[in-house]
């Protein structure tokens, strides 16, 4: 098995390369907050020498309640992304939910994300593939790791091989997620880069009746476990005031803890990738 390397400017995304951080905020709440959060991430990752991609959503189209905040929408969201990219010289990742969003989003962001709930929607997959952008596929909570090959094949047949696979937890009864650590290793056997969404994996879907609950007190433990697998990247969301975040605050890392948190993740990644592989199948 060979590890596919995805090149994003000077950043190399691969399972055997230093991990890349995909981080930011859950949803764009305001231009000023997005700029402030991006600045913090940029400063911390530059200080620690961690390759970094800024993440945020312009529309949370799958909220539990019709009354929940969704975001500024695509037009305004792309303006904010353009300003972040220009100001901090950062690559960007965001998600799309409709086929018409793919082309205009790909003109601004570097990586387009396929949401977990939509990962089997063929028309959306094809529209995303045809942009030529790098694709981040969130593994659906209801699919086994080996079933990701069908989604990969759809992208390949539509002409796109620049694919990242993202683990974000699996359904465990009602209102709960668990993370199958062996499942991430199984996805790595595809050769494609695998990243771990350590904050969304802390969700309790529907756990607060009209919105998702979460377990951010365990954010460090879960991320440490994932990084021990030797992954291409870590996906996290942070907020300066998680209790008042407009989406997924219960899962968000407090922004002021970002530097210490990432120091630990980098130390684990450096250590694990310094080891010679051991083939215990023989």
Swiss-Prot record:
EC no. given is 2.5.1.55
A GO molecular-function descriptor: 3-deoxy-8-phosphooctulonate synthase activity
> Per the record, a Pfam family?
DAHP_synth_1
Q: What is this protein called?
A: 2-dehydro-3-deoxyphosphooctonate aldolase
A GO CC term attached to the entry: cytoplasm
The disulfide bonds in this chain are none
Localized where? Cytoplasm
The EC class name is transferase
Q: Could you tell me the superkingdom of the organism this chain comes from?
A: Bacteria
Protein family according to the UniProt entry: Belongs to the KdsA family.
């Amino acid at each position: 098995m060979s590890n596919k390397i995805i090149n994003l400017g000077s950043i190399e995304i691969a399972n055997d390369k230093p991990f890349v951080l995909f981080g930011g905020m859950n949803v764009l709440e305001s231009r000023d907050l997005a700029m402030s959060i991006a600045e913090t991430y940029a400063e911390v990752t530059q200080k620690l020498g961690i390759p970094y991609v800024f993440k945020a959503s312009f529309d949370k189209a799958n909220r539990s309640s019709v009354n929940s905040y969704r975001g500024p929408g695509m037009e305004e969201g792309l303006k904010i992304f353009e300003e972040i990219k220009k100001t901090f010289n950062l690559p960007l990742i965001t998600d799309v939910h409709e086929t018409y969003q793919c082309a205009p989003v790909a003109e601004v962001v570097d990586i387009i994300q396929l949401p977990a709930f939509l990962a089997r929607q063929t028309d959306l997959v094809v529209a995303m593939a045809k942009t030529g952008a790098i694709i981040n596929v969130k593994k659906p909570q209801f699919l086994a790791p080996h079933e990701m090959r069908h989604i990969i094949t759809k992208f390949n047949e539509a002409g796109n091989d620049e694919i990242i696979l993202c683990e974000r937890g699996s359904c465990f009864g009602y209102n709960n997620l668990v993370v199958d650590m062996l499942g991430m290793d199984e996805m790595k056997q595809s050769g494609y880069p695998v990243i771990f969404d350590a904050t969304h994996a802390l969700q309790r879907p529907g756990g607060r009746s009209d919105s998702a609950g979460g377990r951010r007190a365990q954010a460090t433990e879960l991320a440490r476990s994932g990084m021990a697998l030797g992954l291409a990247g870590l996906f996290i969301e942070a907020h300066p005031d998680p209790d008042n975040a407009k989406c997924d605050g219960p899962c968000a890392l407090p922004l002021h803890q970002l530097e210490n948190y990432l120091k630990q993740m980098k130390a684990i990644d450096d250590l694990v990738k310094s080891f010679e592989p051991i083939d215990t199948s023989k």
